[in-house]
Amino acid sequence: MEEASTLKSLLEQFSKIPGNKVLVHGGGRSATQVATQLGIETKMVEGRRITDEAMLKVVTMVYAGLVNKNIVAQLQANGINSLGLTGADINYMRSDKRKPNPIDYGFVGDVREVNTDILADLIARGIVPVLSPITHDGKGNLLNTNADTIAQEAAVALAKRFDVSLIYCFEKDGVLKDENDDSSVIPLITKADFEAYKADGTIS
């Protein structure tokens, strides 16, 4: 979704959705590109980014800055009054630094709490929150946090106040049984299916 034309189209469609809405974004491809330009090595384990001090600076610049503000600007152009946030902004989401075992992911956060009142207040004011995948621990430290997890946690929290639908958007047509075959979309995944696919390595 980081391709400019694809993102523009997605945001145009998002802007046409009636009623209250929240947008959560990632930006991993852009972060990797900027890191490479800065001579910083990108290390991934099971699809998750190892975030040392240097990489934390990169993802904060890219996620909370470049990507987030570009999305906000495009939404404003579409007539959507939006506000870009990290978890540290107005303290909307706190995380705990992930323990370094069995894998030390560095400055990566696991969500601890969502400030539902803050998000609900923004929504009530007609503001669309645009949430970047950077949170904080409440002790002055920023943490790289999975965007899908942020979307999930925000949806669960807001479901206490609103009728919530959680929609994931990505480049493929769905979850693929074979990542090299775009026609191998799995139309429905139950919890049992998920556990079986994870066990046999179809998904990770």
Where are the predicted features?
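Nucleotide/pyrophosphate-binding catalytic subdomain
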Residues: 1-204
